[in-house]
Amino acid sequence: MAKRATRARPGRGRFITFEGGEGSGKSTQIQLLAERLKGQGIETLVTREPGGSPGAEIVRHLLLSGVGKLLGADAETLLFAAARDDHVHQVIEPALKKGVWVLCDRFTDSTAAYQGAAGKVDAAFIEALTHATIGDLEPDLTLILDVPVAVGLHRAIKRRGKAVADRFEQESLSFHESLRDAYRKIAADNPKRCAVVDANADAATVSERIWETMQHRLASALPARARA
């Protein structure tokens, strides 16, 4: 499989991923950022993982229903990789090539955190799968929304209402603590790509923190009026 460039080329869109544990506010913040970018005249696509393409959405249903857990951690990781392969080929890469900015709710760091650090799947196995499916594609910026585990789980319960908790919301408190630690380590190991955003605040405050990070990290790609 051909390697993909990790740095944005002239005319190519920017790839921004949102990461974080349950209830970190990713879904809200990704929409707020998309609206802000569109207001600056930047064509933007919001997508998610697992899912984002017809084939990947089928896999998403299987994964969140708990089927992956029945098959075991390694098999679950394979399902995530299969969904991501379809998503990247069908949605993400075509959009980036057209100059569209892609905002994705979860990407490879979720696999490293959920299946790797918290699920104990071998890191080398995950890395090999990643290179086999999507090559060297990496986000231009990864925003890791950080909240205390108790806060995040409370938000998730409130958001869910009477609906049944999904596969990952049902995990133990120690699992979610491991997730938070894993994301912090990912950020520390990849400081040029990742930015940790304190998301333990109201949505408007977190949105401003994200925009300030965008202005700092992707200033050259933003219109002049957006840098002020």
Swiss-Prot record:
Native species: Afipia carboxidovorans (strain ATCC 49405 / DSM 1227 / KCTC 32145 / OM5)
Any single GO CC term annotated in Swiss-Prot or TrEMBL for this entry: cytosol
Pfam families for this protein: Thymidylate_kin (PF02223)
Protein name: Thymidylate kinase
Record EC number: 2.7.4.9
NCBIfam families: DTMP_kinase
Keywords: ATP-binding, Kinase, Nucleotide biosynthesis, Nucleotide-binding, Transferase
Single GO molecular function: dTMP kinase activity
UniProt catalytic activity: dTMP + ATP = dTDP + ADP
PANTHER family, per database record: THYMIDYLATE KINASE (PTHR10344), UMP-CMP KINASE 2, MITOCHONDRIAL (PTHR10344:SF4)
Residue positions binding ATP: G20, G21, E22, G23, S24, G25, K26, S27
UniProt record similarity statement: Belongs to the thymidylate kinase family.
Protein task: Phosphorylation of dTMP to form dTDP in both de novo and salvage pathways of dTTP synthesis.
Gene Ontology biological process: dTDP biosynthetic process; dTTP biosynthetic process; dUDP biosynthetic process
